């Protein structure tokens, strides 16, 4: 696919420099064979977060069964079986890093009957055993609409249950054809209403959506009980991914933030480099408890 993306504006040009903690964290994760979404998804904040000693752990391997056209993670219909010792390795890494807030995510595993939900449960329990004071945010897939699988994770009562809608409904067929917008909204509503969890979602902009469409999606999320939101600029990972339609200005991101706050979101992160787990601990702390 030929790259037709517009030229990057000045506000998206980063000066990258690795801090003292970057190398130590890289060695720790490598030694334990742990995957991170930071590296697998080519996150632009990798050096900043790793230098500060934080990372988002990627569960169930680093190969996804879906082919979302914005995502840099490798794909296959038949990925390797989950590693049974991964929960303990992740928990050990979180303890070594002395994390006060642990962010977990995973690839989508449509090849597994429960979508990997039992593996999620084992990981949450292992972290709580190793680091009982640590908060946990779970950025989960949609489990193909399997409510029993979703309930397994919700029953572990993570501090934040995160699931990204990613984009506006009009662009789903183009951007993430194997997902369903309504399914994602229903997931968030079930976690919030049935289990009383603090729910969070995220969107990328710059793929052809309008401001009004983003506003409508934010209203949908608010109506379905979502209380935290992240909004960031889509950046094309490679020439085979969908191109950037436009670069959203910092002023527009401020507008998204103001709109989300007016709709009742308790925590809003909106900016060019914002990603799902960016400043996750601070966002969780800023979110008022569920009544």
UniProtKB/Swiss-Prot annotation:
PROSITE patterns: RADICAL_SAM. Keywords: 4Fe-4S, Cytoplasm, Iron, Iron-sulfur, Metal-binding, S-adenosyl-L-methionine, Transferase. It is found in: Cytoplasm. Its EC number is 2.8.1.8. It is an enzyme of class 2 (transferase). One of its GO terms (molecular function) is lipoate synthase activity. Its cofactor is [4Fe-4S] cluster. Residues 50-266 form the Radical SAM core domain. GO terms for cellular component: cytoplasm. PANTHER family: LIPOYL SYNTHASE, LIPOYL SYNTHASE, MITOCHONDRIAL. This is Lipoyl synthase. It comes from Chlorobium luteolum (strain DSM 273 / BCRC 81028 / 2530) (Pelodictyon luteolum). The gene is lipA.
């Amino acid at each position: 696919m030929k790259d037709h993306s517009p030229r990057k504006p000045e506000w998206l040009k980063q000066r990258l420099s690795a801090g003292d903690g970057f190398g130590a964290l890289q060695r720790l994760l490598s030694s334990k064979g742990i995957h991170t979404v930071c590296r697998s998804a080519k996150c632009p904040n990798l050096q900043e977060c790793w230098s500060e000693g934080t990372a988002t752990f990627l569960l169930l391997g680093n190969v996804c069964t879906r082919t979302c056209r914005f995502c840099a993670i490798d794909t296959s219909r038949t990925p390797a079986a989950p590693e049974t010792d991964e929960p303990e390795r992740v928990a050990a890494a979180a303890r070594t890093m002395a994390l006060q807030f642990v962010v977990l995510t995973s690839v989508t595993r449509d090849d597994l009957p429960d979508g990997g939900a039992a593996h999620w449960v084992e990981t949450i329990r292992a972290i709580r055993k190793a680091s009982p004071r640590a908060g946990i945010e779970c950025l989960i897939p949609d489990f193909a609409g399997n409510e029993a699988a979703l309930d397994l994770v919700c029953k572990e009562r993570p501090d934040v249950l995160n699931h990204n809608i990613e984009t506006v409904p009009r662009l789903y067929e183009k951007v993430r054809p194997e997902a369903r917008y309504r399914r994602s909204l229903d997931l968030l509503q079930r976690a919030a209403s049935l289990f009383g969890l603090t729910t969070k979602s995220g969107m990328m902009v710059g793929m052809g959506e309008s401001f009004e469409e983003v506003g409508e999606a934010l209203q949908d999320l608010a109506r379905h009980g979502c209380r935290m939101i992240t909004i960031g600029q889509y950046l094309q990972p490679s020439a085979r991914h969908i191109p950037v339609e436009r670069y959203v200005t910092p002023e527009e991101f401020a507008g998204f933030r103001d709109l989300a706050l007016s709709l009742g979101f308790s925590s809003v992160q909106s900016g060019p480099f914002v990603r799902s787990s960016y400043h996750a601990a601070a966002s969780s702390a800023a979110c008022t408890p569920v009544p």
